[in-house]
Regions:
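A short glycine-rich, His/Asp/Glu-containing loop-to-beta-strand
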Residues: 6-44, 48-49
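Short acidic-glycine-tyrosine-enriched beta hairpin
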Residues: 64-83
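Glycine- and acidic-residue-biased ligand/ion/polar-headgroup-sensing regions
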Residues: 47-60, 64-65
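Short hydrophobic/aromatic-rich beta-strand segments that constitute the beta-sheet cores
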Residues: 41, 61-63, 86, 99
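A generic "binding-loop/recognition-motif" signal
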Residues: 38, 47-48, 66, 82-83, ...
């Protein structure tokens, strides 16, 4: 399989927005914007790894059992099947980061949620 994303795909979520900047065989690049004080679900992916690069703002990243703090120009790598989430630690400024997904099957359906502030855990 490959990516099910195409350039220009976008969506709004309770925590902010995402937009596909580029995609190809086994990769996808997204720009993700997180509202002030918002947090994404604690989740993992069965088929993809992710690389996050902070472009603007400050973040707290849960990676497995660790809490990491990242600022502009810093990055984090999320291996396949690793629980993770990101929180915008600012009360006023949006957090923007670039997400690079790599794997054999890239699809929005590859999200296993464990905790979610917006009632999306199944």
């Amino acid at each position: 399989m490959a990516t099910n994303y195409k350039r220009g795909d976008h969506d709004s979520r309770p925590w902010g927005t995402w937009e596909v900047l580029d995609s190809g065989e086994n990769f996808c690049v997204k720009k993700i914007t997180v509202k002030p004080d918002a947090i994404l679900s604690l989740q993992m992916h069965n088929f993809r790894a992710e690389h996050w690069i902070i472009v603007d703002g400050e973040a707290m990243v849960v990676l497995g059992e660790d809490n990491l703090y990242r600022h502009k120009d810093e990055a984090v790598y999320i291996p396949v099947k690793t629980k993770h989430r990101i929180k915008n630690t600012s009360q006023q400024v949006p957090l923007t980061f670039i997400e690079i997904q790599t794997g054999d099957n890239l699809d929005e359906a590859d999200i296993v949620r464990f905790e979610d502030s917006y009632g999306r855990v199944k």
